[in-house]
Amino acid sequence: MQFSKDMVAAFARPAILCLLRQGESYGYEIIQKVKELSNGEIQWTDGMLYPILHRLEEEELIQSRWGESETGRKRKYYSLTKHSTPAIDQYRMQWTTLNEFLAPLWATQKP
């Protein structure tokens, strides 16, 4: 399924933060988790993900460190900061409100 840029921009930030709540991760792993959790319906690219990771890091919602993979390759690992919990809570409230607004509209929509 193709998502518009606006839709991706709206849900990518809270999705990344929620995924990082499960523990630190690197870019390719985040892309794979999104694909897996969406049963392949959502497929992010490096070009979409990394600018968002950089913005989240600039806003101090995430932090990064360089590490090595099991094969010795360098990877940049991302994790949450102390500032991320309030942001996640705010995103949750916003998405809940939007869902509560849209759910009855979807239900009453005529074909």
Question: Regions from the language model: what does each represent?
Answer:
Residues 3-48:
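N-terminal helix-turn-helix DNA-binding core of bacterial DNA-binding proteins
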Residues 4, 67-68:
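Short, solvent-exposed loop/turn elements at beta->coil junctions and helix N-caps
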Residues 50-55:
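Short, hydrophobic-biased segments on the C-terminal half of alpha helices
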Residues 60:
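Glycine-centered, phosphate/nucleic-acid-interacting loop/turn motifs that mediate DNA/RNA or nucleotide
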Residues 64:
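Short beta-strand "wing" residues that participate in macromolecule-binding interfaces
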Residues 70-92:
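Basic, amphipathic "hinge/linker" alpha-helix immediately C-terminal to the N-terminal HTH DNA-binding motif
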Residues 86-111:
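Amphipathic alpha-helical dimerization/coiled-coil segments
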